[in-house]
Amino acid sequence: EENTNALMTSCADALHFSMMSGDVKITNSLIEYSHDDALNIKHGYFYKVADADTSSYTFTFTRITTSMPLPNEGDKIAIYEESTFNSHGTYTVVSAKEENGKMLVKVKERIRNFNTWEASRVTFLSNTPNFVFSNNIVRNKRNRGILVQVPNAVIENNTFMNVGHGSIQAATAMDKFN
């Protein structure tokens, strides 16, 4: 703004995180004047369910996010219907391998009613960050405030002022919002 010390960055997001795991906490911060998002954190769009063999407890997935690793034994995955976000369950991985561009993932739990499922997506729960965004001020933004694309995020006690295109967009890897 003219005659002030306020400057807008020429880059897009002030904070942009991708493919993180562990604890990611942003607290007691002032974020302002970024060109696009004050914060964008993403991780979880993992695979699309291509098929399932319910007798062998094996899913066939195709990749959506190319850089996501295969799950290991004991990892947790969750499956959600694309159009409704309804859960098709959380599964524990027994084994996973890649064959001909597809992922074959054997799970511990029984796959129920697969023949009734609509198009569904998989979230790799064991490889997503524990995200906390609290006690922050996001202001003077011409675009979106924060874009959160990870499951189980905690967003609390923040102030959004002069944000042009919405304060919070939550697209959290198909989980539901409380």
Identify what each model region corresponds to.
Residues E2-D13, G22, H35-I41, R142-Q149, ...:
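Short glycine/acidic-rich loop motifs that flank beta-strands on beta-rich extracellular proteins
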Residues T58-T66:
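Short alpha-helix capping/helix-loop boundary micro-motifs
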Residues S87-V132, R139, L147:
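Small/polar beta-strand repeat architecture
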Residues M20-K25, P129-V132, V150-I155:
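Short "repeat-start/strand-capping" segments in structured domains, especially the N-termini
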Residues T66-K102:
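Ser/Thr/Gly-rich low-complexity blocks that favor extended beta-strand/coil architectures
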Residues R121-V122, N143-R144, A173-N178:
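Short, contiguous acidic/charged loop-to-helix segments that flank catalytic cores in large enzymes
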